[in-house]
Amino acid sequence: FYHPEKYFLPEEVVIKPTIGELFDEFLNKHPLSEVRKKNFRVVKRALLRYELYVRATKRGQKGFILDVDLVTPDTLRDMWDFFQNEYQYYELYPSIYEAIPEKRTPQPRSKNTLIDCFSRIRTFFLWCFDNKRTTNRPFDKFPIEECTYGTPYYITLEERDRIFNADLSATPQLAIQRDIFIFQTLIGCRVSDLYRMTKLNVVNEAIEYIPKKTKEGNPVTVRVPLNDKAKEILERYKEYEGKLLPFISEQKYNDAIKKIFKLAGVDRIVTILDPLTHNEIKRPIYEVASSHLARRTFIGNIYKKVKDPNLVSALSGHKEGSKAFRRYRDIDEEMKKDLVKLLD
């Protein structure tokens, strides 16, 4: 009677899952696209490295375990500091990176990247709370700021045509990537969606696809009619087998775009936000051009003419009310001039 442990049946012993095991359960049960799962796994590995870092560096913490029930806003601040400076710890504590490696050497994380990481950690904690894995809600007292972005810059139709008509016969490989870039400016998809396209995505003189990024919510088929330029480009590559166009790796595509802009003489200065310092800096557009500029060019130029976000997002595959899409509203000086002229 006085020895209750004698009556405690072995199956009642509850072994508490580690944060890694909980994270795996979250990834299995929470509806996420493959792309987002990959992003969450990056955060999971960083959390496990944080655990090892605390054990290695903090006095009396050799047995430290990151326990969802015990994380406080102070823990989150310490984690933020670790995430921010992790690129320095890579060389100081190599054993941590041998235990939980990354493909790429850690680089300084910008504030937007840190905000993204901690938004994912918050999503994980809310899932743990909603699924009765913890009663702890450390993010209630740890607010996360919104990401800061500059106003999107894009190329004008005149600049696009200059690139389309540039003589790149001396560099045939660049000429192919130029055609792909122009095609992307005419259908406005993300590069990940472009690279999955085959001839089967061409349906009744339009491109049809389901954006990968919105797949996990409610998949929507985006249909973008092909204009004459887009048809002309597809005609050039109709003999090409396999994918829709001769794609190369995304990194090489981005490098090619910069060279193409320079050769075509598209060199106007644009203002961008430095991702690490958040200071405005001026750069020639060919230094910062990338595949995403093709998407912005499609959206920006249509938005300028149509000014109806719902119509444009039907073509761009943005979710309704997307924060990314809102940035296009403060995009165009001419539009602002048109509006104030109404008051003349």
Model-assigned labels for residue ranges:
Residues 24-35, 44-151, 166:
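N-terminal core-binding DNA-recognition domain of tyrosine recombinases/integrases
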Residues 126-136, 184-206:
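Short, charged phosphate-coordinating catalytic segments
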Residues 1-32:
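N-terminal helical hairpins
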Residues 169-171, 239-243, 258-314, 318:
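Short, basic (Lys/Arg/His-rich) helix/loop patches that form interaction surfaces
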Residues 213-215, 250-253, 316-341:
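Catalytic-site neighborhood detector that most strongly recognizes the C-terminal catalytic loop/helix
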Residues 196-202, 303-305, 313-320, 327-331:
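A short, basic/aromatic helix-end/turn motif that makes direct DNA contacts
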Residues 111, 168-182, 305:
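Conserved catalytic core of the tyrosine transesterase superfamily
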Residues 187, 196-235:
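Conserved tyrosine-mediated DNA breakage-rejoining catalytic core shared by Y-recombinases
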